[in-house]
Amino acid sequence: MTDDTEYRCSFCGKEHHQVDDLIAGPDVRICSECVVLSCEIVEDRRNEALAKQDAFIKRKQRSVLEGLPKPAEIYAFLDEYVIGQQKAKRDLSVAVYNHYKRLVSTKSESENEVELSKSNILLIGPTGCGKTYLAQTLARMLRVPFAVADATALTEAGYVGDDVENVLLKLLQDADFDITRAEAGIVCIDEIDKISRKADSPSITRDVSGEGVQQALLKILEGTAASVPLQGGKKHTQYEQASINTRNILFIVAGAFSGIEEIISSRIGRSNMGFGSDLLRKDTDVFDQILPEDLRKFGLIPEFIGRLPIVTAISHLDGEDMIRVLTEPKNALVKQYKRLFSLDGVSLGFDHEALEAIVELALKRKTGARALRSVMESILSPIMFDVPSRGDIESVRITAETVAGGGPHLTMRCARSNYIRSA
């Protein structure tokens, strides 16, 4: 004789004729009404858990945003290391702040929230004026992985040279191969002007190191899951690869764009009927008026330009700026060499005329501020060779005569003397 309980719902106790359906299992039955009720309970608990998770994410997001340096703080930090370039530092401070604010926001975005797009940066300015150094200083402040790549070393896939994904390999290496950290890093691609296409019109032949590289960089700049060859060089199926999502990587591309001044001047001169001559007295005045059409005429393809919505100019460094570069930043060269000499118990000083002479030599090399170190090394290297071996030197003073090839003025611990540099 069959037990009546076999025809009852194990949860509500209703008999099979009281419900639409009764689902049987091993030693248990559940009616259709209890199934619906169970689904509602599960959905309620799921929504409650999601609400708690969303509240936790928002609390964490607020905490991260509170710890994120504000644009004014980023600017102040850059000001300690970079001389001049006020507009560029201001533009970069805002752009970097918005980028990492977007990165934090993206982690808690729902389908109904506005999606924040990434804004990569194009830096334009003469060689040796701090384009790469600005990006490097930003990364150091934010403590994020950073990599610098030379655009001239890149080629289109299938040709001799590095694939564009090698740019990301350097970032991954700086992140100690932590992919999560690398995906929030900063990449600076220098010499981007060197991959401009050779003509204003689309190429009918393969331009593997120019337009081809621009095309290859498009997806990476916009955001894609890129396969990075861990061995470097070209991608190969036999080599191990890592997948990196570039959606949250900030790209800062930089270039001198020599000759673009004429393109801008020509456009402004036509549109202002001669008034442009008053506006173009300085390179910065020209660069501040740059438009996408100028970049296109220079040789960047429209799709590439579109992925660099923030364009800012780096101004040329004159003699006065170079002296400030030598002496004022937190890690100025003069301060570095003074520190080196102090480790040997010797003080180092520079006459203002000596600094002017050093800057004059550096300007002749036409490589901007990066020439300052090599000039300083050539002057101080013979002195740094002899001073550590002598215990009678109290101080060294560099004069204009020292820069011209003479010896520095030395203060001895017991008497004064002159150090004559050997030929």
UniProtKB/Swiss-Prot annotation:
Summarize where ATP binds, as residue positions: 126-133
Keywords linked to the UniProt accession: ATP-binding, Chaperone, Metal-binding, Nucleotide-binding, Zinc
Give the protein's recorded name.
Answer: ATP-dependent Clp protease ATP-binding subunit ClpX
Task: Please indicate if the UniProt record lists Metal-binding as a keyword.
Answer: yes
* NCBIfam families membership: clpX, PRK05342.1
Tell me the gene name: clpX
- Family per UniProt? Belongs to the ClpX chaperone family.
> What lineage does the source organism belong to?
Bacteria, Bacillati, Actinomycetota, Actinomycetes, Micrococcales
One MF term from GO for this chain? unfolded protein binding
* Any single GO CC term annotated in Swiss-Prot or TrEMBL for this entry: HslUV protease complex
Positions binding Zn(2+) in this chain are 9, 12, 31, 34
Ranges of residues in domain ClpX-type ZB: 1-50
Whether Chaperone counts among this entry's keywords is yes
Record-level GO BP terms: cell division; proteolysis involved in protein catabolic process
Q: What does this protein do?
A: ATP-dependent specificity component of the Clp protease. It directs the protease to specific substrates. Can perform chaperone functions in the absence of ClpP.
InterPro entries associated with the record: AAA+_ATPase (IPR003593), ATP-dep_Clp_protease_ClpX (IPR050052), ATPase_AAA_core (IPR003959), Clp_ATPase_C (IPR019489), Clp_protease_ATP-bd_su_ClpX (IPR004487), ClpX_bact (IPR046425), P-loop_NTPase (IPR027417), Znf_CppX_C4 (IPR010603)
HAMAP family reported in the protein's UniProt record = ClpX
Question: Which proteins does it associate with, and in what oligomeric form?
Answer: Component of the ClpX-ClpP complex. Forms a hexameric ring that, in the presence of ATP, binds to fourteen ClpP subunits assembled into a disk-like structure with a central cavity, resembling the structure of eukaryotic proteasomes.
